[in-house]
């Protein structure tokens, strides 16, 4: 679980501010427009006094003539300022959300593999989409309301004190009570908001699991189970939403009740003879209308608090991810192309959070241009060895050497640029076949090179039958391709990269026998003059390996070539007999 730091609202906003400040020009323009918008409303109310006292009370026709023109001018100012403020704040908000998402996305890309082992994809997607969107509440809608309604309250208070400071003092007494009520409600809003964000992550995870595993749901009749799971998390989301509504619904009438008490006191105070002597019809109308007008901004400020607290809670959640340490890259060695001499020297490794080592005292050597195969039952640690070679994880004991240099001395980008990986879990992107083969290197390779790689991987057989050929978009994770076709695209990608080190993790597991024979020829050619680490379930694919290592429960129990291991009648021979029925 992610640990959210319990920061105060001010601390959180102060940390968010550097993301907003580059666009402060837009904020300043928006603030000026909002103040003008609030001022136009306040000035409109102030016109009631001359209209009543002079226009109607003293029958001053001049006031009645210019008053409509002033009203029209104020309405034009109100409309223009409203447009400018909304546009500027939305522009700033969009920039902040975009930058927050970019920063979060880039940070997640730099996180170690262990981070993704411990987090569900749905939760992380919710952080990038839902939580980032909630930040907009802090920088757009809430900002508009705070500035505009704050300016309205200040303007109305100033006008009331100008016309009758005696009546206005009553509101000064009530203000601390309103402030205390808002502060108490704020705490409740933030608590509920955090729970809503966590629940939203669960909703996303539940939906994602059903969508990705739709075939399994259908074949195993899991509709009821998935429906119950989704209904459960959806209901929790609804319950948290209702708690937020309840808190908001209680706060609104509470603030309005306090304000109504102030109105009642004002009316009562206005009946005192000493006060009545200072009041005219216009004055009491302006003061009383201003007090009623204060209800709207007070209510808006109370409502915006819930919105603002959601944004602050989202910020805390996102900052907790941004505070996590990214993948360590302390190496300084950069190489264009390594020779490919690999050595594991007494390596012991445990996955984060697990006490039992997955690998025990592993020592192996793969000379340049040689092929070493790892065999063993599922979960024996074969793929873990491959993961360590690419530094997806760092070892706790021992040393891994590449060309005689500790793996940790290389810069990660330089190290991984030396390795081509084809795993049993092929991931393809929702793009064309050509772009998938040349992934991340589109500008480096020509169309002819991409086609040659596909042909060497025996992928052109099915690609040429497609209407768009290499330009065919294959859908999310290659959904439009068969398992064997997806595997051949991945092999073509490795062929194109032409790296000195090759890792084949069950690379032919999804191929039929005929395709496997064809692709094995390409892999044999690819492995020449390259250091290859092959993890295989089908033992027939690794019989020609220079050395075969048998891994059992994280330990190498046998090593040798195919003939040597078969002659020993050990674990390898047993696996071979089980597979071929000998």
Swiss-Prot record:
Residues 28-310 form the ABC transmembrane type-1 domain. The keyword ATP-binding applies. The chain crosses the membrane at residues 16-36, 63-83, 153-173, 253-273, 275-295. CDD domains: ABC_6TM_MsbA_like, ABCC_MsbA. Disulfide bonds: none annotated. The keyword Zinc-finger does not apply. InterPro entries: AAA+_ATPase (IPR003593), ABC1_TM_dom (IPR011527), ABC1_TM_sf (IPR036640), ABC_transporter-like_ATP-bd (IPR003439), ABC_transporter-like_CS (IPR017871), ABC_transpr_lipidA (IPR011917), P-loop_NTPase (IPR027417), Type_1_exporter (IPR039421). Gene3D superfamilies: ABC transporter type 1, transmembrane domain, P-loop containing nucleotide triphosphate hydrolases. One of its GO terms (cellular component) is plasma membrane. SMART domains: AAA. Involved in lipopolysaccharide (LPS) biosynthesis. Translocates lipid A-core from the inner to the outer leaflet of the inner membrane. Transmembrane domains (TMD) form a pore in the inner membrane and the ATP-binding domain (NBD) is responsible for energy generation. This is ATP-dependent lipid A-core flippase.
């Amino acid at each position: 679980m992610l640990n959210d730091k319990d920061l105060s609202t001010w601390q959180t906003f102060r940390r968010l501010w550097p993301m907003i400040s580059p666009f402060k020009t837009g904020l300043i323009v928006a603030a000026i427009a909002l103040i003008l918008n609030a001022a136009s409303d306040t000035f409109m109310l102030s016109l009631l006094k001359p209209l009543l006292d002079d226009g109607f009370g003293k029958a001053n026709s001049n006031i009645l003539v210019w008053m409509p023109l002033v009203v029209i001018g104020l309405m034009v100012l109100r409309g223009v300022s409203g447009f400018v403020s909304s546009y500027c704040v939305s522009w700033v908000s969009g920039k902040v959300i975009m930058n927050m998402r970019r920063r979060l996305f880039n940070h997640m890309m730099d996180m170690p593999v262990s981070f993704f082992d411990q987090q569900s994809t749905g939760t992380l997607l919710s952080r990038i989409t839902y939580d980032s969107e909630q930040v907009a509440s802090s920088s757009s809608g809430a900002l508009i309301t705070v500035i505009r309604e704050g300016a309205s309250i200040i303007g109305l208070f100033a006008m009331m004190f100008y016309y009758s400071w005696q009546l206005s003092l009553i509101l000064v007494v009530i203000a601390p009570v309103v402030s205390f009520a808002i502060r108490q409600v704020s705490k409740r809003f933030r608590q509920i908001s955090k729970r809503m964000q966590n629940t939203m992550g669960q909703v996303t995870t539940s939906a994602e699991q059903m969508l990705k595993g739709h075939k399994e749901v259908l074949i195993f009749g899991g509709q009821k189970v998935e429906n119950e799971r989704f209904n459960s998390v959806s209901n929790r989301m609804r319950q948290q939403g209702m708690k937020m509504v309840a808190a908001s619904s209680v706060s609104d009438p509470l603030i309005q009740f306090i304000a109504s008490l102030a109105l009642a006191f004002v009316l009562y105070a206005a009946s005192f003879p000493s006060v009545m002597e200072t009041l005219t019809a216009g004055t009491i109308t302006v003061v009383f209308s201003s007090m009623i007008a204060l209800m709207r901004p007070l209510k808006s400020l109370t409502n915006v608090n819930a919105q603002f607290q959601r944004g602050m809670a989202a910020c805390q959640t996102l900052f907790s991810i941004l505070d996590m340490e990214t993948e360590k890259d302390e190496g300084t060695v950069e190489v264009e192309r390594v020779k490919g001499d690999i050595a594991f020297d007494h390596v012991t490794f445990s996955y984060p959070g697990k006490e039992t080592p997955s690998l025990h005292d592993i020592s192996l050597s793969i000379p340049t241009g040689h092929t070493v195969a790892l065999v063993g039952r599922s979960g024996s640690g074969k793929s873990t060895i491959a993961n360590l070679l690419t530094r997806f994880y760092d070892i706790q004991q021992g040393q891994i050497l590449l060309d005689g240099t500790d793996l940790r001395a290389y810069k990660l980008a330089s190290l991984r640029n030396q390795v081509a990986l084809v795993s049993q879990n092929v991931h393809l992107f929702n793009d064309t076949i050509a772009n998938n083969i040349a992934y991340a290197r589109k500008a480096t390779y020509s169309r002819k090179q991409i086609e040659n790689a596909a042909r060497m991987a025996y992928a052109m057989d099915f690609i040429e039958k497609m209407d768009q050929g290499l330009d065919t978009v294959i859908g999310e994770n290659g959904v439009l391709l068969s398992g064997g076709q997806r595997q051949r695209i991945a092999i073509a990608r490795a062929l194109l990269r032409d790296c000195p080190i090759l890792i084949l993790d069950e690379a032919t597991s999804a191929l039929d026998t005929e395709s496997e024979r064809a692709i094995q020829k390409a892999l044999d050619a690819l492995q020449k003059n390259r250091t290859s680490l092959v993890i295989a379930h089908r033992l027939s694919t690794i019989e020609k390996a220079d050395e075969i290592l048998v891994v059992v429960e994280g330990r190498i129990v046998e090593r040798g070539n195919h003939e040597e291991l078969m002659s020993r009648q050990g674990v390898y021979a047993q696996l071979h007999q089980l597979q071929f029925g000998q």
